[in-house]
A protein has these predicted regions:
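An acidic, low-aromatic, low-complexity terminal/linker signal
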Residues: 1-173
Length: 173
């Protein structure tokens, strides 16, 4: 396996590999761009529900949800990526993931599909593949006429770890 493929495998939490050369991903849309995350990091996908705002929480935290008795912070990927924030629609979803031992949700415009792709079609992200920070991108998959941006959840939410802990503490108080 090439150094790039090793990096991608390590970047995708728990590696959603189906076979030696397959990745299994959940794909979704945010601000017209298609993204994907490793299916093994995804705990569930929910329709939008009412979020409870937490006083004095930072702007990247939209609020918290009570999911079967567990308080889960929810972030809006539009806000996180610096896109124009918009109201949720009937297609909006909350994707609940586990990242670095923390469970959190993030809002996406819509979920597309679960997809298996050959690891060989994934390349390192060019610097200007998207308007988001390339540090958050594990790679880019080329599927026919579309680009699939694979997110590195660990890096994407690492800066929010302390914020999330404070939000959870405030919500529990």
């Amino acid at each position: 396996m090439s150094e790039l493929q090793d990096h991608i495998s390590n970047s995708l939490t728990n590696s959603g590999e189906v076979g030696d050369d397959q990745l299994q991903l959940v794909t979704f849309e945010v601000a017209g761009e298609e993204f994907a995350v490793d299916i093994l990091a995804v705990q569930e996908i929910n329709r939008m529900m009412e979020l409870t705002r937490v006083p004095q929480s930072p702007p990247e935290v939209e609020g918290v949800i009570n999911l079967r008795g567990k308080i889960i912070p929810v972030l809006d990927l539009r806000n996180r990526f610096g896109f124009k924030v918009q109201e949720s629609t009937a297609q909006s979803r909350i994707v609940v993931v586990e990242v670095g031992g923390r469970v959190l949700g993030f809002i996406v415009d819509r979920v597309h599909e679960v997809l298996r792709i050959p690891q060989s079609i994934v390349e390192a992200a060019p610097a200007m593949v998207s308007s988001i920070d390339s540090d958050f991108i594990a790679g880019v998959g080329k599927l026919d006429d579309r680009l699939l941006i694979l997110l590195d959840l660990g890096r994407l939410f690492s800066t929010e770890a302390e914020t999330i802990d404070k939000t959870l503490a405030a919500a529990a108080a």
